[in-house]
Amino acid sequence: MALEDMEKKYRISDIARELQVSPQEVLLFVKQEGGRVASTSSMVGEEIHGLIFGHFSVEKKMVDETKKIRAEKEKRLSRLEEQSRKTYEKEQHLSETLSPPAPPLVVVHEPKKEVIVAAPIENIPEPPSKPLEIPVAETPASEEPDAPPAVTELIEQPVVIEQQPLAPVSDAPVPPVIIELPVPSEVPESQVLPESRVLPESQVLSESPLLPEPPVLSEPQEQQELPELPELPEIPALPEPAPKKEEPSVNEHLVSFDAPQMMGGLTVLGTLDMQAGRHKKNRKKNFQEQADALKDEFEPKPAEESRVEEKVVVAKKPPVKAAADVKPKPVVADSSSSAKKKGKKKKKPAVDDKVISANIQKTISGIDDRSSTGSRQKFRKMRRNEREREHEEDEAFREAQRLVVRVTEYASPHELAELMGITAKDIIQKCFALGKFVTINQRLDKESIELIALEFGFEAEFISEVEATAVIVTEDAEADMQTRPPVVTIMGHVDHGKTSLLDYIRNSKVVAGESGGITQHIGAYEVTVEGDRKITFLDTPGHEAFTAMRARGAQVTDIVILVVAADDSVMPQTIEAINHAKAAGVPIVVALNKIDKVEANPEKIKTQLSEAGVLVEEWGGVYQCQEISAKKGIGIAELMEKVLTEAEMRELRGNYSREVPASGIIVESELDKGKGVISTVLVQRGILKVGDPFVAGNTMGKVRALMDERGKRIPFANPSQPVRVLGFEDLPQSGDALTVMVTDREARDLAQKRQVIRREHDFRRSTRVKLDSIARQIKEGLMKELSVIIKADTDGSIQALADGLMKIQNEEVKVQIIHQGVGQITETDVLLAAASDAIIIGFRVRPNVNAKKLAEKEDLDVRFYSVIYHVLEDVEKALEGMLSPELHEESLGSLEIRQIFKVPKIGNVGGCYMLEGKMFRDSKVRLLRDGVQIYEGQLAALKRFKDDVKEVDAGYECGMSLKNYDDIKVGDIVEAYKIVEKKRKL
């Protein structure tokens, strides 16, 4: 399998989902990078995948951080869920086993014999493998208690805590597992058992259910249960729930202990209330500490486990043979009834999955009122940390914005110091330290500005000279705002009837004045409809070369009328106009033109528009549509009504105050021989009056005259009104903003500042381009260039020509625009063309008499055009002629060597037979042996019957020899061919 087949593919939509960005944004980026993709479902390779992740690195980082935070949150929630589940299980287990505390363990001492009452051990977590057996002697119930049969247990090392006198309870913690009870000296021997014995658990536990072994008490205040001491001796008199045969004897022995005899040495160290202790801990500890405390409380400690194991071992000792008739009885023999009760109790508090799920959900959501204080505090702390982190991020962003310096590309140290709030001396010293020797007014390049700003802790953001010197605009007062006419731009493909529609609306003949019947200028017109309502129309060119003009028209407009010919289809320029309108965020009104023609098909146009993202209202969309005929005037009134309705919905308003400085956009500019520079301006704010000083781009001026589109002089211009302005000192560029200043000096200073920055930028850029071009030509070989000088009637035409010519290029040839300007061709243009070996292109302009004579003298190529199509076609042909031709091989014929002749001083000569074609004396040949090329070169001689010939046709015999090659054999094939040059296309 090829490597390309093994390459992993990725779907664009999956990549966008992983980066959490729009699939359309990823698709647009892939197309910009040259990827051949059709939709978001297309697949891309590893290289494009890496480029996408490199471009969206910030989004990728945010996604990774989000995943990390989400993983930590899920881990924390799962831990809380586990703790909640364990806590619930512990509480259920506690409700099964917890009961009022059992009486403490009693140990009776005498000089040689001891009595040990062991605490119940049945519920210890590790149960014994065998039931504990205690031998008990059977005696009749009528026998006196002074001589009981011996119920003995062999105790090798009895577990007894050191004897203590009866005293007030001390504050020191005492293990409550075994409590000592000193025996008073006046106890009669009849009351003392002959040997130590263990009370059966059925007697001890008949009153209360079993309890787990209580832990060591650590709080002295829980020892307040001491008044229960006198009730302990009543334990032997407890009734039996279900006695058996051997139980009466044990009961009689228990009756022999009297209360007055046990009062002397009984010490009660305290009782443990598990329920109260748990509530207190819940109030003091947080969720995690509560879970740990419950775990320690219900699991036996290592010391207690060893002690329990020791008791179990003691209980398993075999009995003494003195009582042979004693039946071994397990300790839990009488626990059948209690076991039944336990079984019933276990069924009652069964674990409910619904309760557990509810507790888990409450814990996760943090709204459980019964949750521990620690969990609520933890939740509040988490929220507080999140707010602090967001606040820190906002502060960091604001701090970063404060550390950003907005500066032009070639700023002086003085200007840079003012922006950073330091002195110019500091910047000059830093430049010296970096090895750059500058003065206070010297211009710094882009790299130096970035490096200096970084040294002082700032980040440089470069802006244009217009942005750097932008005029601060005051906020409009509500009292000055009035309804203004809408600005409507007519867009569409070439020859679809845009200007014809405007002709019918204006009742004029604009098309008749355009070369070739196509619009090559952007025109602005004001039309009055329905009485006194006004609409400003902008007519844009539909040819592909005028993309910049259409973009400018969409930026200053309020509504776009999209004209589509009903007898044609949706063309590329139609799609481009839709994209311009959507990018500018303006509504679209569709006008289906040429509806009067027989071949008109409006439904097909609507279908194609819906595929382009424009769904008309008739089909459930939001875009209004009107079928019209610009020639016959069908549907024009309805179209204007829809335009005015759209304008009313947008509530267009403008500032009509005379006190506010006026501002507008330059739509088009041209150079008139008698009037000078004339620019078409669309006023956007305020009222433009005659005599106002203004600045527009890098030039300034003073309004000398205002004229409407028909050449009539007017005293002022209101918002949304197009007007032709006279009074510019230099030719402004289309799209520049015109701003009225207070005085002429302010306008001049601002324009000069912009001109200085622009001159420095142009000078540095031209020098750098020349050096780069030299390095590129050395590295890649000489690149052919076609140098041209463009002179046109308007600035918009120059921009369209320049954009169109710059697109006609490839890796070998390109167009180099030496100079471009507005106005007629002069002697200066001719001299520049002669010095740079360039071609002069005049678009709707002619040279003066002196320039024409000078061009003939210098033998320069000066071409004149009126239609932009012809300019682009001729330049493209010229560039194709400059391309290196493609070389193709053309076969002429072949012959077979059938005999070899050895000629002295010449070498081997082949006697050949011409198989096909022709063999020429000067042809290039190759020698083939068994289909393998052996030699490639030329013929040394070609003869027929010892006569030199120029060519031999097929079917004839001839003799031939090869130049500088003598190893020919019978059966070799000689092919003749020639190299043909073919013209290349761009």
Swiss-Prot record:
Residues 339-348 have a biased composition (Basic residues). GTP binds at residues 492-499, 539-543, 593-596. Residues 185-210, 218-235, 315-338 have a biased composition (Low complexity). Residues 75-94, 292-313 have a biased composition (Basic and acidic residues). Keywords: Cytoplasm, GTP-binding, Initiation factor, Nucleotide-binding, Protein biosynthesis. Its main location: cytoplasm. Residues 593-596 are annotated as: G4. Residues 483-653 form the tr-type G domain. Residues 539-542 are annotated as: G3. Residues 517-521 are annotated as: G2. GO terms for molecular function: GTP binding; GTPase activity; translation initiation factor activity. Residues 629-631 are annotated as: G5. One of the essential components for the initiation of protein synthesis. Protects formylmethionyl-tRNA from spontaneous hydrolysis and promotes its binding to the 30S ribosomal subunits. Also involved in the hydrolysis of GTP during the formation of the 70S ribosomal complex. This is Translation initiation factor IF-2. It comes from Pelodictyon phaeoclathratiforme (strain DSM 5477 / BU-1).
